[in-house]
Amino acid sequence: MSAAMRERFDRFLHEKNCMTDLLAKLEAKTGVNRSFIALGVIGLVALYLVFGYGASLLCNLIGFGYPAYISMKAIESPNKDDDTQWLTYWVVYGVFSIAEFFSDLFLSWFPFYYMLKCGFLLWCMAPSPSNGAELLYRRVIRPIFLKHESQVDSVVKDVKDKAKETADAISKEVKKATVNLLGDEKKST
């Protein structure tokens, strides 16, 4: 590990949160530096993602759990920059999930797939302004979206209008059936 990366990693491990509190307790009880404990845990998770049963679930929990928690905190904060960061992550996560749906049958047979997927998701959620989600959104997803935005808007409007028409028709039929049912009930009493 380069000196700069090691320093950033060490600073990250000394930030105040529940995970670093746990690392501090483990460090105090064992006498082992928290950096080594964290690297050991990372190594075990990586090995589990390669060889473990349920690696898919663990990978999806990592890719969903922390971002969902931080997204809820972002919604509740007055700062809107973090909202944009996490909305960007969820857009990339959604696009990746759709792409993965069609390729998962083949990719899941590769031994390092879930470890690489987990690494990809961690890169996308990295706490930096130029993380993977931002890069992929800016360079891939956004240009495609802007190119097809008007066509997608048109399709969405058509589907929304048809759904409203269908809901109105169903509501009208339910009201009519209710009136008929109540009318038949009054006649029988």
From Swiss-Prot:
Residues 52-53, 104-105 are lumenal. The chain crosses the membrane at residues 35-51, 54-74, 85-103, 106-123. Residues 1-34, 75-84, 124-189 are cytoplasmic. It comes from the Eukaryota. InterPro entries: TB2_DP1_HVA22. Keywords: Endoplasmic reticulum, Membrane, Sarcoplasmic reticulum, Transmembrane, Transmembrane helix. Plays an essential role in heart function and development by regulating the organization and function of the sarcoplasmic reticulum in cardiomyocytes. Monomer. Homodimer; maybe disulfide-linked. Homotrimer. Interacts with ATL1. Interacts with ATL2. Interacts with ATL3. Interacts with CKAP4. Interacts with RTN4 (isoforms A and B). Interacts with ZFYVE27. Belongs to the DP1 family. The short lumenal loops between transmembrane domains 1 and 2 and between transmembrane domains 3 and 4 may impart a wedge-like configuration, thus deforming membranes. This is Receptor expression-enhancing protein 5. It comes from Rattus norvegicus (Rat). The lineage of its organism: Eukaryota, Metazoa, Chordata, Craniata, Vertebrata.
